[in-house]
Amino acid sequence: KVVNIPEAIVYHRRRTTLLKFFRQVFNWGVARINLGKKNNKMLEPLHFAPAIITIVASLITFYFFVDPINNGRLFELGLGFLMFVSGVGAWYMKDIRGFFLLLFIIPIQIFGYGLGFILAFIHRFIFRRSKWSGFTKSYY
């Protein structure tokens, strides 16, 4: 049962640095795998998207630096998509500064979650080890 309580006060802790934000989303990726290990229904195909994006973007970046002439288009396409999404976010916020912030925040969020998800997936599903916690010290 869901109830709306308009007078309820909800405290939200914002991350004060990009490193703390990275740790937070990394742990979310780890937590999703741990939840999926408890109940398969809590691990849906959509949860794999940041991990897939992390792998594909890493490969595209690697191949761009190996052979920039032949692999430049894919790299440019990825940067163009990032700029488009950042532009949509800035338009939504009605603040141009959001565009420049989102150019950094979006990759940190996707890569942080994706890396946590990938490492926890390998740890729990491939090596069949016990629960893994990710960042535990200096999390916040």
Predicted regions and their residues:
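Short linear elements at protein peripheries
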Residues: R124-Y140
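Low-complexity, flexible helical/coil segments
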Residues: K38-L43, Y63, K137-Y140
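Membrane-embedded multi-pass helical conduit in multi-pass membrane proteins
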Residues: P50-F127
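Short linear functional motifs in flexible/disordered or boundary regions
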Residues: F22, K37, E44, L119, ...
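Membrane-interface anchor segments at the N-terminal boundary of transmembrane helices
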Residues: K41-I52
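Histidine-centered active-site/metal-ligand motif
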Residues: H12, H47, I110
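Catalytic donor/gating beta->alpha subdomain of glycosyltransferases that bind UDP-sugars
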Residues: K1-L43
